[in-house]
Amino acid sequence: MSRPLAVAITGGVGAGKSTALASFRRHGAATVSSDEIVHHLLKSDPDVKQALVERFGVEVLGPDGTPDRERIAFRVFRDREALDWLEQLLHPLVSREYLTWREELAKLPNPPAVCVTEVPLLYEVGAESRFDKVVAITAPRKLREARGAPSDGREERLLPDREKVERADYAYVNTGTPDELDVWVADLMATLTEANSEAAK
């Protein structure tokens, strides 16, 4: 049995990455998001908690005594230096957790053909080499804002959609319905599953 084909989903805020990830899950892929991994680290890693308190103070802790994402976001998204520091703290840990997850999948008696991870800053942090295939999900800025994408300066740090599409193996312009996206993902899953099967021969 071959190892799962490693796929990354990337794209701008509000483009529909999480919706696409859920579709991949429905169609048989193992899935995890970078946000899920970060949430796990904030709640369970004492070294992360200590580093955050030393940098920002106890004000970033929530009522349960663990780092609160909204309080951290309030601090860092208006301070480029603080955001850079946070990314340098978390990205190596997220990468470690992701690789461990992928290794555990490969050890299963019947591993999935495809494992998919949502990585918003894939190209920005140079993580694309860790994946076999990259899927870019894009949508016009006005549509993403209508979906609730914040206008707090985060977009300024991201590569333009055009460049992401050029660098990705597959791209989808998400201007339609969730059902239309789901159909596209189903077709892509069939392609990826077949590719992994061929590679295993």
Q: Which sequence ranges carry the predicted segments?
A:
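Short, well-ordered beta-strand core segments
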Residues: 31, 133-136, 171-172
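ATP-dependent NMP and nucleoside kinases share a basic, alpha-helical "lid"
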Residues: 99-147
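Short beta->alpha linker loops
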Residues: 36, 67, 89-90, 139, ...
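Glycine-rich phosphate-binding loop of ATP-dependent small-molecule kinases
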Residues: 1-67, 108, 186, 190-201
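ATP-dependent small-molecule kinase phosphotransfer cores
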Residues: 36-114
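Short alpha-helical
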Residues: 15, 47, 81, 93, ...
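Small-molecule kinase domains that catalyze NTP-dependent phosphoryl transfer to phosphate-bearing small molecules
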Residues: 98, 128-130, 141, 147-201
